[in-house]
Swiss-Prot record:
GO molecular function annotation: urate oxidase activity
InterPro entries referenced in this protein's UniProt entry, alphabetically: Uricase
GO term, biological process aspect, one: urate catabolic process
Record's function text: Catalyzes the oxidation of uric acid to 5-hydroxyisourate, which is further processed to form (S)-allantoin.
Protein name: Uricase
Pathway(s) the chain acts in: Purine metabolism; urate degradation; (S)-allantoin from urate: step 1/3
Keyword Transcription regulation: no
UniProt organism field: Haloferax volcanii (strain ATCC 29605 / DSM 3757 / JCM 8879 / NBRC 14742 / NCIMB 2012 / VKM B-1768 / DS2)
Keyword Cell cycle: no
Enzyme class: oxidoreductase
Signal peptide (residue range): none
Binding site for urate: 65-66, 177, 194, 242-243, 269
Family: Belongs to the uricase family.
SUPFAM superfamilies named in the record: Tetrahydrobiopterin biosynthesis enzymes-like
Length: 308
């Protein structure tokens, strides 16, 4: 039994910058200014005291979902942290502190990202990023989910997930797909080298969920760095399947971040199909694949890294 509000778009200007994150070899990301901090939020609440609203039409204990929306928007102005997950914990704890009839809260959000735009420098010699004008990004975005309940009246985190979603990558060569089952149902030809196009969502959980909040930035895992690990491993590895590729990405993520307990993948194969291979050199013409498309899901933890 639960209810809530979703698609709550909230934007905060000049939020606290994210600074002091640990850098890694695969990424140049070392922080974000948070001049624009945007989220698409979903909140779900639980509590036995809400049962009469379902069984008897008695709304005495019901917090209207419109009020939940307003609560989220108001708290965006009160939040003094720098991370998506930190804001979710701040809002979730606020709900539990404010409404005793709520026994558990789950708050999740997709980050709304903004791209920096170049403008001429004042002296006309080159370009610099504008600190006023941004472009709404169509690229991948961060994700977070925080679940909370009470322990002796104090809100505590019971579950946490962070992620980067909507990552789309194309590798023009250096990927294969061979050695799979050949039977009367097989029509797909083996490919020793192919242009591989995948869409990818990556999720991770910390050993200590408090690390997800970003209060100690050196233990925070930015989604931008995980994104960069994915494309660097894709560039480095000659994979024989998408399964092979995401496993190698997972190993690298766990290697770089010992504070993580697990990493999970949801991948979709969007590989283009060859139309012409008779062009000079390595050139070819390809087309979009028809529906249906293949997908892969995989979870791994530190035990997988220890076995290497």
């Amino acid at each position: 039994m639960n209810y809530g509000k979703e698609n709550v778009a909230v934007y905060r200007t000049y939020a606290t910058p994210l600074e002091g994150v640990r850098t890694i070899p695969e990424s140049s990301f070392d922080g974000r200014d948070n001049v624009l901090f945007g989220l698409d939020v979903r909140v779900q609440v639980e509590g036995e005291e809400f049962l009469p609203s379902f069984s008897e039409g008695d709304n005495t204990k019901v917090v209207a979902t419109d009020s939940m929306k307003n609560f989220i928007l108001h708290h965006a102005g009160e939040y003094d942290g720098a991370t998506l997950e930190g804001f979710l914990e701040f809002v979730g704890s606020g709900f539990l502190d404010t409404y005793s009839q709520m026994s558990a809260v789950e708050v999740s959000a997709d980050e709304i990202r903004f791209d920096e735009l170049p403008v001429p420098e004042d002296d006309g010699d080159g370009y610099e990023a504008s600190d006023l004008v941004f472009r709404v990004s169509d690229n991948e975005s961060g994700y977070g989910s925080i679940s909370l309940t009470r322990d002796d009246g104090t809100p505590v985190i019971t579950d946490q997930t962070s992620g980067v979603t909507g990552l789309e990558l194309v590798k023009v060569e250096g990927s294969s797909f061979t050695g799979y089952v050949q039977d009367e149902y097989t029509t797909l030809p083996e490919r020793e080298d192919r242009t591989l196009y995948i869409s990818l969502d990556i999720f991770w959980s910390y050993d200590d969920p408090e690390d997800a909040l970003g209060e100690d930035p050196e233990r925070y895992v930015p989604s931008e760095q995980v994104r960069d690990i994915a494309h660097v491993v894709f560039d480095e590895v000659d994979s024989n399947s998408i399964q092979d590729l995401i496993y190698q990405i997972g190993l690298r993520v766990l290697e770089r971040y010992p504070q993580l307990a697990s990493v999970r993948f949801e991948a979709n194969n969007r590989t283009w199909l060859s139309v012409r291979d008779d062009l000079d050199g390595d050139a070819s013409v390809l087309r979009e694949p028809p529906a249906p498309t293949g997908f892969q899901q995989f979870s791994m933890d530190r035990g997988d890294l220890d076995e290497q």
